[in-house]
């Protein structure tokens, strides 16, 4: 949805909205960005897929984007992930892609990929947002994760 809001002009219901739905930057975790005939979920959107498929609406001016995928994601194949990054770059956009070998859809959840994977994704997302001026300060992902795990363990007791 975030990618569609950023890339698909027909998503805005009214062209004169005072508040745009276009984000300043995109941090995408396993996005389904190909709704075309060969893409995920096409049968549900056959009448309007061209209007909502980010892969088919790549153009210059898309916000800086970082994408995280598992190589075994069954919703979006790696070939599509790489083609998306290539087309984004060719259009003059920033698109950083991180593919995690051996992992499937939703790998970044702490319950699926574990704490190390969870923190790796957050650290890379944080660095991306710092690089583009949306975050400042020192990265505290590990400390934050440790405190959250401690809180959850305390609640469970």
Description of each model-found segment:
Residues 61, 66-69, 73:
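Short beta-strand/loop motif that positions the catalytic acidic residue
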Residues 82-157:
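C-terminal catalytic histidine-bearing segment of alpha/beta-hydrolase fold enzymes
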Residues 32-35, 71-75, 102-106:
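Solvent-exposed loop/turn segments at secondary-structure junctions
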Residues 1-60, 141-153:
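Primarily recognizes the serine-hydrolase "nucleophile elbow" in alpha/beta-hydrolase
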């Amino acid at each position: 949805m975030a990618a569609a809001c950023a890339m698909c002009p027909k998503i805005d219901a009214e062209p004169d909205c005072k508040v745009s739905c276009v984000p300043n930057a995109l941090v995408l975790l396993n996005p389904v960005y190909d709704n075309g005939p060969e893409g995920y979920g096409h049968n549900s959107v056959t009448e309007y897929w061209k209007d909502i498929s980010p892969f088919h609406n790549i153009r210059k001016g898309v916000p800086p984007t970082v994408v995280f995928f598992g190589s075994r994601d069954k919703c979006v194949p790696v070939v599509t992930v790489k083609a998306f990054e290539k087309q984004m770059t060719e259009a003059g956009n920033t698109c950083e892609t991180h593919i995690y070998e051996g992992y499937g859809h939703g790998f970044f959840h702490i319950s699926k990929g574990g704490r190390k994977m969870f923190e790796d994704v957050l650290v890379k997302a944080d660095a991306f947002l710092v690089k583009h001026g949306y975050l400042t300060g020192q990265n505290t992902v590990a400390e934050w994760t440790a405190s959250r795990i401690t809180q959850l363990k305390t609640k469970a007791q």
